Curated annotation (Swiss-Prot):
Family: Belongs to the DnaA family. HdA subfamily.
Keyword annotations of the record: DNA replication, DNA replication inhibitor
GO biological process, one term: negative regulation of DNA-templated DNA replication initiation
Domain of life assignment: Bacteria
Pfam families tied to this protein: Bac_DnaA, Hda_lid
Subunit and partners: The active form seems to be an ADP-bound monomer. Forms the RIDA complex (regulatory inactivation of DnaA) of ATP-DnaA, ADP-Hda and the DNA-loaded beta sliding clamp (dnaN).
Protein name stated in the entry: DnaA regulatory inactivator Hda
Function according to Swiss-Prot or TrEMBL: Mediates the interaction of DNA replication initiator protein DnaA with DNA polymerase subunit beta sliding clamp (dnaN). Stimulates hydrolysis of ATP-DnaA to ADP-DnaA, rendering DnaA inactive for reinitiation, a process called regulatory inhibition of DnaA or RIDA.
């Protein structure tokens, strides 16, 4: 399921960026593992009335988009205007979509590595960063797959700007934390994931969390359809293991 938010931007072209955000990716559904300090810093920035900047980096699938979705959801529920820009989908829009975003309460730029070397996008992000600094009110969250200085950006001033503020590496979850994350996800969806079934999934499947969550959703649907509890034999049958 997805929630839908439309942000109208103050640009000459009256651009509008529709945001399709998963409604189950909130702070309540995020298992922090060794990322408690990162999570606390992020939530502290969201509570501030003035601007703040955090850069999160991790490999794909570690949960960085989840945290940006959660931040957008939290401020949206408070009635604040937010902007989420997934740069891995940059072909859907143009750099001018960032114009006017300094007037929002929160701007989230996801997967900045996807525009490394793109002069137009790099300049647009740099200009937005400077406008946010001047406004003093907008919170800015940016994610990438590596630290700012390793992004191979063509604009040195942007690399310098990204290196300011708080920079965190999103630590990967241990297997025990992945089990806890799966069980939390199940509880939030209204069912229980037995520990032995969870450990079986971790042993037999790709341990990337996105894959595990998709499999859990598949098993939930199959369990409801078949009116059967989640057991290892049932999981083997559904997943053909």
């Amino acid at each position: 399921m997805s929630s839908w938010v439309e942000v109208s931007l103050n640009t000459p072209a009256q651009l509008s960026l529709p945001l399709y955000l998963p409604d189950d990716e909130t702070f309540a559904s995020f298992w922090p593992g060794d990322n408690a300090s990162l999570l606390a810093a992020l939530q502290n920035v969201l509570r501030q009335e003035h601007s703040g900047y955090i850069y999160l980096w991790a490999r794909e699938g570690a949960g960085r988009s989840h945290l940006l979705h959660a931040a957008c959801a939290e401020l949206s529920q408070r009635g604040d205007a937010v902007g989420y820009v997934p740069l891995d989908k940059r072909t859907w829009f143009v750099p001018e979509v960032l114009d006017g975003m300094e007037h929002l309460s929160l701007v989230c730029i996801d997967n900045i590595e996807c525009v490394a070397g793109d002069e137009l996008w790099e300049m647009a992000i740099f200009d937005l960063y400077n406008r946010i600094l001047e406004s003093g009110k907008t919170r800015l969250l940016i994610t990438g797959d590596r630290p700012p200085r390793q992004l191979n950006l063509g604009l040195p001033d942007l690399a310098s700007r990204l290196d300011w503020g708080q920079i965190y590496k999103l630590q990967p979850l241990s297997d025990e934390d992945k089990l806890q994350a799966l069980q939390l996800r199940a509880r939030l969806r209204g069912f229980e994931l037995p520990e032995d079934v969870g450990r079986f999934l971790l042993k037999r499947l790709d341990r990337e969390m996105r894959t595990l969550f998709m499999t859990l959703d598949q098993l939930d649907h199959a369990s409801i359809t078949a009116q059967r509890k989640l057991t290892i034999p049932f999981v083997k049958e559904i997943l053909k293991l």
